Amino acid sequence: MKQEYSLAHLTVLGCPPPEMTYIAARAGYDYVSIRPIYMGLPGEPDYSLAEKPQMLRQFKRALASTGVRVHDIELARVYEGLHPTKYLPAMEVAAEVGARAVLSSIWGGEREFYVEKFGEICDLARPFGLTVDLEYVPIATVNNLEMAVDVLRAVERPNAG
């Protein structure tokens, strides 16, 4: 079985998704993992494809001409004050470009809150055929494997991973 690789957007964050796709193809990657969920961080580029139809068209052309596929989108963060429906436009784009998953991480709240919100994200992603892959980040609220597994077991969603 051939190993397949995905170019993560954080590796080339200064490149919009179309350019990133051409780079991935030239470097031999099978997939790209894009960041169409804008977080509003200082200096962060905005690649909200749902709000940028021209960039989305260019991205689709790049995918079609290179054969590179979309592995996942990021980052559906769980944080206090989150309304998970804000991620719906990005999930629609993810499904439109053939992505497999939404990457998520948990950055705030008590356990009951973040389990509920992660579950809601899973529920929103499921009709699009997307899994929601929980990443634990050392500086986040859910910051180790044990905590991530606890969340996955607690939500009991078939598309949680």
Regions found by a protein language model. Name each.
Residues 18, 29-120, 126-131:
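Structural motif corresponding to the early beta-alpha repeats
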Residues 3-9, 15-21, 32, 94, ...:
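Acidic/histidine-rich catalytic cores of soluble enzymes
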